[in-house]
Structures are given as structure tokens and as C-alpha cells.
């Protein structure tokens, strides 16, 4: 199943528990892409262990001690490959990017690669950068019980041996689709995560990174008062590294938007955009800033921000959607239509894209094309079981349109 070429060997290391629903998708994405699969199960009661074994994994077991770093480190200690790749069950490899990245692993000075992870759930920063691919060495280990990182180990090793290089890979390598609020609540994950982060931060209040993670979780959960406290505490910790400061400002902007303070939210996004992080990392701020400007009637600024979003991530449907909305708002209908059509080439299963396209086509008098797009939107919503299908039909009927 796994690769056997005379190149650097890669061990995929995972920790899992009751992931029978998600694990097959993850394992399908790594089929023939890694040389060894280590799966540490922390107490599953479903078919997770069987699924891992059927995929050819070396299956390990441990009791859960409420410490992700301890479990991660136990898994990677069992690996025999030259490199460690870390994935969760709700993630998958983006094959084209991974293939290119893997070809770089034979570089003798390469210590680790930080990779972009694409977030598919609304409310998350669209892209995050993580150290998920690193050499298999006993002095590279995870730290922190929650939102665990190997970064401190990597930096310490690099300081001791300056010849080592840590490379920021420019394109997304991992897609993450499992942090939806419904899923978090269904599994009780959000409350456990909150408790663990609060316990850690009570002893380590200077940890701006985990202040950001806890604040972002609380914004998602709707506890805005507590979220504001942690996010502002994170900003007070000297000057956090740019990626952490960006996320602190980003989540504060989301919070202030939900509080109705548009001016403050705009200021936060503008401050976030000043941070020296990857252009693609700024996608969320540009998109949300475009929507805020459009809500305030500042249509030119909304359009400019949307163009910046597309420049940052040309293949991101969220950026193209923002451009479609902004272009339509200023009367640039051809560009709006082109943006939605390009987005549909990237994601032909998103009914909202058909709906938006149908609205612009209707506005410019291309009625048959408009009706076809609306039919696609309704069919897509129905396939998802979304009530938006009926709502769209009723709105169209109110306009005298019967499809």
C-alpha cells in the first residue's frame, strides 16, 4: 500500500478516538503517499481501530490522559521513517501539493516544513500555518496539552545547530473539515477544549498562542465577553509573533462585528493586515473587510478589498464570492458573473454560488441562464437537506418566477 522508493521515508503518525466516520476519508488521502502509518488509539468504542488496521496501520493503544502532546509523542516514538507527518482524522492531504513537497525531503539541511492548512468551516481563519512535517529525531517533540506544537523543539534545535533550515511551504498541503460548531457540540469537544485551555492558561497566562485559540473558540461558541478577555490578554503579552498576533486581531474583529461595532472591526482587520504573514494567510481579513465595507455602503473599498482577497488566494471560492458580491454592488456585472463562474469551476457543488450567479444574470436580463442557475441552486440545497431550497423558491415565486 505504501511507498517503497529509495527516497526519504515518511511515517504518518495519528492519534484517534471514535473517528470511524472521518478516518476513512483521511486514510484514503494518504494511500500510497507515506511509507508507514502509526495510529495511536486513545479509547475508541467504534470501528476506528479496525479501520486503521485494515488500512495497514501499526495500531497502538493508550489511556487518554487529557494531554495531546503526550499522545502525539507516544505515536511518533514508534515511527521508523526519516520524516514524521502528522494528521488528524478530520484532515486530508492535498495530493498535488504533497507530491511536490515530498520531493524536497532529501535536502540534507531540511529540518522541518511548516505547511498551510485550509480550513473549510465558516468562522475559522481560512488558512493556518502549522509544523506538521519534520525529521524523526528524539529531540523533536510536542509541547502543550492542547493545541500542541513542536515549534519550540525545532527552534531550540536550530539554535544549537544553525545549519538546519525550517521552510515555510507556500501552498496548502492539508485540508481541515472537522471543526464545525455542530460537530464540536455533538461530541462535547468544545467544553472539554475550553476547560483544558483555561486550566493551562491559569498557569501560563503569557501564552499568547493559546489565548488566541481559546478566544477564537469562545467567539465561535458565542461567549463574547470571555472571548474578549482572552484575546486582549494575548495582545498584552509583549508583541506576539506575527501569525499569533494576526489571529488575535482577526478573532477580535469577528467579535466586534458580532457586537455591531463595525468601526472597531474594520480597524482590527486593518491592523491584522499589517502583520508580516503569508499573503494567503490574510485571505480571511480581506474577505471580511470587503463584506463590512459593503454593509456600510463603502462599495469602492469593498471592491478593492475583494480584489486583494483574490490576489491573496486566486483559487479560493470565498475570495471569488466576495469579488462577485462587490463587483455586482458597484454595477460591474460582467466581472461579477465571471467571478461566480470561476468559483463554480472550483466548487461545482456549492448551491449558493449558483444562487448568486442566477441573481446577477437575472439583473442583466439573461433570463434563461438565470433560471437554469436558480434550478441548480434549488437542487443543490435540496440535496443538502437545506431549508434554503424552499426559501429560494418562495422568493422567486414572489417575483413571479416559477421554475
From Swiss-Prot:
SMART domains recorded: TPR (SM00028)
Keyword Repeat set for record: yes
UniProt entry keywords in alphabetical sequence: Repeat, TPR repeat
TPR repeat start-end pairs: 208-243, 244-282, 283-316, 317-350, 351-387
Pfam families for the chain: Glycos_transf_2 (PF00535), TPR_11 (PF13414), TPR_16 (PF13432), TPR_8 (PF13181)
Signal peptide: none
InterPro entries, alphabetized: Glyco_trans_2-like, Nucleotide-diphossugar_trans, TPR-like_helical_dom_sf, TPR_rpt
CDD domains: Beta4Glucosyltransferase
Protein name, per record: TPR repeat-containing protein Synpcc7942_0270
Amino acid at each position: 500500500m505504501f511507498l517503497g522508493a529509495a527516497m526519504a521515508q515518511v511515517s504518518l503518525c495519528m492519534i484517534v478516538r471514535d473517528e470511524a466516520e472521518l478516518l476513512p476519508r483521511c486514510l484514503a488521502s494518504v494511500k500510497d503517499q507515506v511509507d508507514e502509518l502509526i495510529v495511536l488509539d486513545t479509547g475508541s468504542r467504534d470501528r476506528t481501530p479496525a479501520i486503521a488496521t485494515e488500512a495497514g496501520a501499526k495500531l497502538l493503544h493508550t489511556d487518554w490522559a487529557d494531554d495531546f502532546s503526550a499522545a502525539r509523542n507516544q505515536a511518533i516514538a514508534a515511527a521508523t521513517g526519516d520524516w514524521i507527518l502528522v494528521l488528524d482524522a478530520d484532515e486530508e492531504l492535498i495530493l498535488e501539493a504533497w507530491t511536490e513537497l515530498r520531493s524536497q525531503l532529501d535536502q540534507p539541511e531540511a529540518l522541518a516544513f511548516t505547511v498551510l492548512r485550509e480550513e473549510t468551516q465558516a468562522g475559522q481563519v481560512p488558512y493556518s500555518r502549522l509544523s506538521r512535517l519534520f525529521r524523526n529525531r528524539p529531540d523533536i517533540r510536542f509541547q502543550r496539552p492542547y493545541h500542541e506544537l513542536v515549534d519550540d523543539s525545532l527552534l531550540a534545535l536550530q539554535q544549537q545547530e544553525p545549519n538546519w533550515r525550517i521552510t515555510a511551504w507556500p501552498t496548502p498541503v492539508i485540508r481541515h473539515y472537522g471543526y464545525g460548531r455542530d460537530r464540536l457540540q455533538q461530541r462535547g469537544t468544545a467544553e472539554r477544549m475550553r476547560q483544558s485551555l483555561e486550566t493551562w492558561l491559569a498557569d501560563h497566562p503569557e501564552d499568547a498562542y493559546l489565548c488566541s485559540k481559546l478566544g477564537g473558540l469562545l467567539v465561535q461558541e458565542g461567549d463574547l465577553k470571555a472571548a474578549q478577555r482572552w484575546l486582549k490578554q494575548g495582545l498584552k503579552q509583549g508583541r506576539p509573533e506575527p501569525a499569533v498576533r494576526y489571529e488575535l486581531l482577526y478573532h477580535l474583529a469577528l467579535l466586534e462585528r458580532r457586537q455591531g461595532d463595525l468601526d472597531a472591526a474594520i480597524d482590527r482587520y486593518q491592523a491584522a493586515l499589517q502583520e508580516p504573514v503569508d499573503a494567503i494567510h490574510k485571505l480571511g481579513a480581506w474577505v471580511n473587510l470587503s463584506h463590512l465595507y459593503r454593509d456600510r455602503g463603502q462599495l469602492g473599498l469593498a471592491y478593492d478589498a475583494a480584489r486583494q482577497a483574490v490576489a491573496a488566494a486566486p483559487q479560493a471560492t470565498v475570495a471569488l464570492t466576495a469579488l462577485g458580491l462587490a463587483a455586482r454592488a458597484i454595477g460591474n456585472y460582467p466581472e461579477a458573473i465571471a467571478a461566480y463562474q470561476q468559483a463554480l469551476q472550483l466548487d461545482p457543488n456549492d448551491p449558493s454560488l449558483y444562487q448568486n450567479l442566477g441573481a446577477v444574470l437575472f439583473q442583466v436580463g439573461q433570463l434563461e441562464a438565470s433560471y437554469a442557475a436558480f434550478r441548480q441552486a434549488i437542487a443543490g440545497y435540496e440535496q443538502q437537506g437545506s431549508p434554503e431550497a424552499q426559501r429560494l423558491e418562495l422568493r422567486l415565486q414572489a417575483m413571479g418566477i416559477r421554475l
